[in-house]
């Protein structure tokens, strides 16, 4: 399972938004079934934050959602475009 996309915040608050999620990222990377988690500032758009979550199964993602720590911050998301993807196969990007 992959959750990926982007959120937009006030550019003045972007670094704070990313930092507020540090604990969530660390917890996710140690959670059962989490293969990767990233919440990163976009290098081109100063308002954009890229979201990437990769879990072994839908159940692992559901468990994470039920137990994930909530960030303490209050940076408002102005717009979001994040989707969940069910993946049936994976392989090298250039084959």
Regions found by a protein language model. Give the residues of each.
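Short, surface-exposed ligand-recognition loops at beta-strand->loop->(often short) alpha-helix junctions
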Residues: 8-17
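An amphipathic, aromatic/His-enriched active-site/gating alpha helix that lines ligand/cofactor pockets
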Residues: 23-35, 54-88
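Short, flexible segments with low predicted structural confidence
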Residues: 1, 15-16, 32-34
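Short, low-order "capping/linker" segments at domain edges
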Residues: 88-95
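Short, well-ordered beta-strand segments in beta-rich or mixed alpha/beta enzyme
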Residues: 1-8, 38-65
């Amino acid at each position: 399972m992959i959750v990926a996309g982007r959120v937009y915040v006030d550019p003045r608050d972007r670094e704070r938004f990313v930092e507020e999620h540090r604990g969530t990222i660390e917890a996710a990377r140690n959670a059962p079934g989490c293969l990767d988690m990233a919440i990163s500032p976009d290098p081109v758009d100063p308002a954009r934050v890229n979201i990437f979550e990769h879990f072994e199964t839908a159940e692992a993602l559901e468990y994470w959602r039920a137990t994930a720590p909530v960030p303490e911050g209050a940076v408002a998301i102005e717009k979001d475009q994040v989707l969940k993807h069910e993946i049936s196969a994976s392989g090298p990007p250039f084959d």
